[in-house]
Amino acid sequence: MIMWGLLLTMILIDFGASLRNVYDMKIECPHSINFGESSVTGKVELPPLLLTDAEALVPESSCNMDNHQSMSIIQKVTKVSWRKKADKAQAAKDSFETTSSEVNLKGTCALSHRMVEESYRNRRSVICYDLSCNSTHCKPTMHMIVPVHSCNMMKSCLVGLGPYRIQIVYERTYCTTGILTEGKCFVPDQSIVNVIKNGVFDIASVSIVCFFIRVKGTNYKIMASIKTATANNCNDTDNKVQGYYLCIVGGNSSPVYAPSTTDFRSMEALASLLRAPHGEDHDLSGEEVATYSIAGQIEGKIPHTANAANMLFTAFSGIPSYSSLSVFIGSQDGPVIYSPGLFPRLNQSSCDKIALPLIWEGYIDLPGYYETVHPCNVFCVLSGPGASCEAFSEGGIFNITSPTCLVSKQNRFRAAEQQVNFVCQRVDQDIVIYCNGQKKTILTKTLVIGQCIYSVTSLFSIMPGVAHSIAIELCVPGFHGWATAALLTTFCFGWILILSITLAVLVVLKFFAAILHNSSQENRFKIILRKIKEEFEKTKGSMVCEVCKYECETGKELKAHNLSCPQSQCPYCFTHCEPTESAFQAHYKVCQATHRFRDDLKKTITPQSTSPGCYRTLNLFRYKSRCYIFTVWVTLLIIESIMWAASASETVLEPSWNDNAHGVGVVPMHTDLELDFSLPSSSKYTYKRKLTSPLNQEQSVDLHIEIESQGISTSVHALGHWFDGRLNLKTSFHCYGACTKYEYPWHTAKCHFERDFEYENNWGCNPADCPGIGTGCTACGLYIDQLKPVGSAYKLITVRYSRKVCVQFGEENLCKTIDMNDCFVTRHVKVCIIGTVSKFSQGDTLVFLGPMEGGGLIFKDWCTSTCQFGDPGDIMSPKDKGFSCPDFTGHFRKKCNFATTPVCEYDGNMVSGYKKVMATIDSFQSFNTSSIHYTDERIEWKDPDGMLKDHLNILVTKDIDFENLGENPCKVGLQTSSIEGAWGSGVGFTLTCQISLTECSRFLTSIKACDMAICYGAQSVTLIRGQNTVKVSGKGGHSGSSFKCCHGTDCSQQGLQASAPHLDKVNGIVEQESEKVYDDGAPQCGISCWFVKSGEWITGIFNGNWIVIVVLVFFFILSLILLSLLCPIRKHKRS
């Protein structure tokens, strides 16, 4: 048993170790496969291995896409390593030496000519690795290049490299074909001409990975191009290495070949490679702070059979951070150099003893354009206790959130469309969704209606058509549905309800009447007792027994006490008691006969004669009388019909301001008409009245004021792109020579700072192998790597809040866009924006961490000149300027211990500004945008959330010359074209109207959607001469409503009926489009209006499903038959 237990323990330990060796490689794919030989790439950094194990690595793939066959071929490389000389006890410039040998590797990223192109055509992958080594260990970096078609074929697969397992995860981005950078989809442009046209294209920093391809030919003399780019003194370029770099831009592009004079991407890639030949480091997490011990510069032989040393290296020991694979340029073949523990010299300022990187990674700035962000369509269906929703967009969905739903990460793609499915657990409140910068609202009331209709129809499935028609009315939310249920129940079985309810009411009334009767008799008896007692006390004295001290009510009771109590007997039950007051009192509490004398007195009192009262009347009421039942039945039907029709009214818009002019449709102009209110930035406002003369009501003029939603226009200064990065602290120690003698890889980083402690070593700060004190250098290097663009920043120069105001006063039609503290003045009307409550101010910085359609953050303390690492805006790439690096304000300290290598310490901040902002993002003000338009100098948008408010004042003067104002000559023709949506539901309906305008060129007015009795929605519109298409949205109505397009009191001849309120899919509505307030002072629906609505409903039923009427009449007749059987006519006998 012990052996089995040990074996099981070893298996579990081995299984846990294998789980720890699984790493993820993410490959980002566009969701629309474009034409051309596009490839996608991914990489993953792996933990270090022993040198001998690393040299035996072979990539293995279990993916259903075969790896390119040439990757399994043995690759001969020249291995150059260094070691200490045996005859040297202390370090010096000649105390170490290099050795060169040939080793065989499999699967390194020494790609052959046309390999990637063949892999694309043959649907194969290219899996290879890079090595970053010191003298004892290597860190592998696995790269994978696959055709873009693999994104459709695979979601994930497993690749092996030595002891490691790499899970390849294909992740679809919301980009159609572009590259995801800064949260936006960027499409690079390769034309050089477009770079010259400033402002035509955007500039973005895009990641790039390049692989050197060795191939001979006159067209592949790469050193000649490098000589031109660097102006070095290399003359013998024909005998140098020949080949080119194959690059993939942004992890998703067709191959970019460098050098090339026709592709700007190629030119930028080669320039960046020459500027920083070591590229990005390969530090793992936690290796930001590391120590190198530099042995010094040394030469080696390439290839190993060379007669003399021809390649320059820098020997080091410590954590390997940069690639150990390079290409020797000294011959046309370009031997691959494998140099563990050695930095190859990659600086191309000279021609001798240098190499080119085999694999290079970095960032390049490219011109291009960002993909258009399309609005989302969202719909939901009822699913169980909640709702199942789906959002889709023509392009992609860059951001979707909801405060009321659980938005999943599951995406589906159909061609260029992206779909996101999610679940909302509650439908008792409206579903709010933010998608692609738009606020969508799903009115869940309609979902509940649909479930109700389904349930009622299923319950009466024997007659589904009739049940469906009745369910449509029953399931309307609110009072209308209950009124429908009451009306149908009363019509069919009203007599049962009348009898039952009347009987219940009578029982309750008789119960209370009996209680009141008994209570009055008891009160009369108590009054008599009180009078007897008072008379006895006046004539004979106290009624308190002298023995037991009990207060009696009658004389007989007192006489019994005087006889029994002295004899130790109870005067009521004659039980023996102790002759003490306490004993008697205790007995009286349990005695059952204490009421004996009271009952005798009640019998002697003559009861009061009662006349026929309420109780008797209730007992005689004939509630089963057919006359009573019929009268109540008809009355209830009339009242319920009126209440039913009245309940199908429109949804009243509640303004979010206090209007001090409680206007009506007609306003006599005795005084000036003034409105003063605050209006949310996302709201539109329409005010319409008919102004009449105070002297003659026949003289009038129409007033129509339209105020659009607020527009925000800003003048900005584009600060450029904001970057995130990782700060590294590296210590480089060498025993001899000045610090300036050596080049470190971080010298080519865009942002770096170095502090040198030169010739400062002492005996307490010296490794054992150094020759003495004051001979060497400790270089403390700070540099930023893994740079990644995260957003764009704009400095606010001016902010302008404006609204478009249009006024139709009689024939006069004028419009103007007014700003804050500005007025629009006509002869009779004055509209002013008095002030604006805003969160923006001049000097603020707007930062967009993604598409501008998704909104941004407001920074009050954005640094622009002297920036420290960790400040907002610390790492910037201004447009048309060089890279802007932050200041490192901390102090360096060299920490020493006896006989150990010195270590640099830095007391400054090590966290980037972006990471700090994301950790405290809730403390920053944010804003959403809608209908945004932007350039480098201006940004214009509208606020969809209504977070800002304008204080508005409207003044209409009373000095109107009604006599000289003629009638408006504009003639409006109305025709109803189509209808969408449902009546009586939360979603409502949309009526399409064809409006013709004659006799004038422009006319600002409103078109309403009405049935015969009431209007349910209106749209303010500026008509132009000729035909106009106007869509009017409304909510309300009933199954008999025939909706028409109306202008004032005139309506179209034909009306259309909307669908029943139970759509299978409920579409989301754009919040900003629905936020409008319409005020025309129209009168409310009165009693006559209610009867019209009832008649329209009944007419609609006859014109629609008349089978419902037949069924209802059948149940009505059946109900009458039951009434005649259960409540027969009472027969009276003749006397």
Curated annotation (Swiss-Prot):
Disulfide bonds join C29-C151, C63-C157, C109-C128, C133-C138, C175-C185, C210-C247, C234-C351, C376-C435, C380-C389, C405-C424, C452-C475, C735-C770, C739-C777, C751-C885, C765-C896, C780-C904, C806-C815, C823-C832, C863-C867, C970-C1000, C993-C1045, C1010-C1015, C1046-C1051, C1085-C1089. The gene is GP. The lineage of its organism: Viruses, Riboviria, Orthornavirae, Negarnaviricota, Polyploviricotina. The record marks A648, S649 as: Cleavage. Residues 1-18 form the signal peptide. Glycans are attached at N134, N235, N347, N399, N928. The modification Phosphotyrosine is found at Y615, Y628. Residues 516-533, 588-605, 592-603, 611-625, 1122-1135 are annotated as: Binding to the ribonucleoprotein. One of its GO terms (biological process) is symbiont-mediated suppression of host TRAF-mediated signal transduction. Residues 517-627, 1127-1135 are cytoplasmic. Keywords: Activation of host autophagy by virus, Disulfide bond, Fusion of virus membrane with host endosomal membrane, Fusion of virus membrane with host membrane, Glycoprotein, Host endoplasmic reticulum, Host Golgi apparatus, Host membrane, Host mitochondrion, Host-virus interaction, Inhibition of host innate immune response by virus, Inhibition of host MAVS by virus, Inhibition of host RLR pathway by virus, Inhibition of host TRAFs by virus, Membrane, Metal-binding, Phosphoprotein, Repeat, Signal, Transmembrane, Transmembrane helix, Viral attachment to host cell, Viral envelope protein, Viral immunoevasion, Viral penetration into host cytoplasm, Virion, Virus endocytosis by host, Virus entry into host cell, Zinc, Zinc-finger. A motif (YxxL) lies at residues 615-618. PROSITE patterns: ITAM_2. It comes from Dobrava-Belgrade orthohantavirus. This is Envelopment polyprotein. Residues 19-495, 649-1105 are lumenal. It holds the Pfam family Hanta_Gn-H. Residues 757-777 are annotated as: Fusion loop. Residues 611-634 form the ITAM domain. The chain crosses the membrane at residues 496-516, 628-648, 1106-1126. GO terms for cellular component: host cell endoplasmic reticulum membrane; host cell Golgi membrane; host cell mitochondrion; host cell surface; membrane; viral envelope; virion membrane.
